[in-house]
Amino acid sequence: MLTNATARPTLPAVDLKRARKFYEGTLGLKVIGEDPSPGIFLQAGNGTSLYIYQRAATTADHTVVSFEVNDIEAEAKELKRKGVKFEEYDIPSMGLKTVNGIATMGNYRKSAWFKDTEGNILAIAQGLK
């Protein structure tokens, strides 16, 4: 049924202008459409997109979008240069501990988490070979 469908993350924003500035200016995504509701569509890699819409305050305590990257250290360095602050976690029950904002999970994955201007938790991740 949905095995060939493209998934599009949908994120809330209290201040759509502020969110747009972050996603365009800080993350480098391109606005590819606007919705009068109001909302914006942003182009991500490999033909994927995000939809961000304005709504009253809301919070999520989990990752809502993860961007797959080839070099997590280089991406984290560039995002830090642009003012992004990475979260630090130490969760022994999950075997999860960040070092300088990046967690290595076994021998298969690295991830780093940060918040957008609206409090949504985003991540960059790299599969390890």
PLM region spans:
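Helix N-cap motif at beta-to-alpha junctions
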Residues: D15-L16, V69-E73
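Conserved catalytic-core motifs of GNAT/GCN5-like acyltransferases
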Residues: T10, K30-P36, I91-S93, Q126
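N-terminal beta-strand motif that seeds the catalytic metal site of vicinal oxygen chelate
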Residues: M1-R20, T63-V65, A125-K129
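A generic "structured core" feature
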Residues: E24, I40-F41, S93
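Amphipathic alpha-helical segments
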Residues: K17-K30
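Vicinal oxygen chelate
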Residues: M1-L2, A76-K129
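C-terminal "cap" of GNAT-fold acetyltransferases
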Residues: L2-T6, V14, S37-L50
